[in-house]
């Protein structure tokens, strides 16, 4: 889509209207109505409460764990998750568990071992970037509910691709309302330039707006990128 004439034209028009860049982080003078419009559109797409934009999905995954979890908590991560999730987990003091790729028996083992922790979150790619297999999100959600865990899905390689209407693994596996956090990119199916996002429950997004360092200390997305992504 990055070469599609409609996206190129939408990007040009937005640059003419809003300038080349924002020259600031979001909370100073880096927020325009179009940023909020795109956040609302992403929330509607994933059927979530709210969304926060990042400069890249690497930042979204890098900035999601540390604000939410402490050394009293547990992060349970698929062994083939993207490097950005791996690095994000490393930045957090939570106890770490890793289960074999899409192996529900091994995931359940990790969940049992993590029962002493305060909060537990299961993290997985929706579609794994190297092998292309789809995570069994419905089964993951079943285990999360059984063992009182949160669920986070990175939809970077699945949104716009899988599902009856391209709405990602939650559409494919019918798990809307069961996933607590989604992350994703604007650099693939949603325009092909750059940019990332985290979308999910309102209280989680509110916390990230206050404490997620890649959001707080990175310049806001340029209007031309917003314009093209809105056109998608």
Regions found by a protein language model. Name each.
Residues 1, 28-32, 83, 105, ...:
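Short, small-residue-enriched loops and turns at beta-alpha junctions
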Residues 97, 101-153:
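Active-site phosphate-binding strand-loop segment of PLP-dependent enzymes
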Residues 71, 91-93, 147, 178:
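Short, structured coil segments at secondary-structure junctions
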Residues 64-83:
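Conserved PLP-anchoring active-site segment centered on the Schiff-base-forming lysine
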Residues 190-232:
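PLP-dependent aminotransferase class I/II
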């Amino acid at each position: 889509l990055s070469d599609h004439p409609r996206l190129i034209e939408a990007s040009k028009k937005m640059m003419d209207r809003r300038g080349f860049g924002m020259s600031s982080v979001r909370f100073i003078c880096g927020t325009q109505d179009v940023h909020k419009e795109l956040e609302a559109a992403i929330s509607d797409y994933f059927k979530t409460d709210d969304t926060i934009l990042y400069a890249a999905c690497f930042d979204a995954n890098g900035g999601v764990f540390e604000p939410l979890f402490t050394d009293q908590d547990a992060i349970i991560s698929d062994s083939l998750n993207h490097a950005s999730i791996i690095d994000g987990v490393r930045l957090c003091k939570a106890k770490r568990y890793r289960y074999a790729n899409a192996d529900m028996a091994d995931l359940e083992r990790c969940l049992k071992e993590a029962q002493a922790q305060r909060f537990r979150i299961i993290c997985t790619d929706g579609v794994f970037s190297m092998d292309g297999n789809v995570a069994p999100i419905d089964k993951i959600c079943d285990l999360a509910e059984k063992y009182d865990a949160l669920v986070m899905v990175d939809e970077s390689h699945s949104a716009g691709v899988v599902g009856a209407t391209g709405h990602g693994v939650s559409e494919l596996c019918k798990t809307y309302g069961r996933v607590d956090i989604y992350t994703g990119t604007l650099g693939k199916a949603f325009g092909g330039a750059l940019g990332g996002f985290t979308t999910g429950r309102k209280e989680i997004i509110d916390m990230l707006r206050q404490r997620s360092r890649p959001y707080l200390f990175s310049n806001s997305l340029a209007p031309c990128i917003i314009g093209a992504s809105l056109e998608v």
